[in-house]
Amino acid sequence: MRIISQDGTVDVPYENVIIRVEGRTIEAYMGATYALMGVYQSTDDAIAVLREIVTYSREKYATYHMPQSNEVKNGRVQRL
């Protein structure tokens, strides 16, 4: 699975997040949450993005586009 960041580049570190998170509760893997908190406004927003990444990986989508920071509010991803 490829994950494409907001500027269109492929973010390799997020692929490691997919592997480590799959099959576990997302909240338990805080390393991924902290990495995403550098992009999004709150822990809830970071967890919302992480949930979406895991859902995409389980459903075997080939590519996941990271949402813009203004598309994640109150712990929900809302694509504009």
Question: How should each PLM-predicted stretch be described?
Answer:
Residues 1-80:
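Eukaryotic intrinsically disordered, low-complexity regulatory linkers and tails enriched in Ser/Thr/Pro
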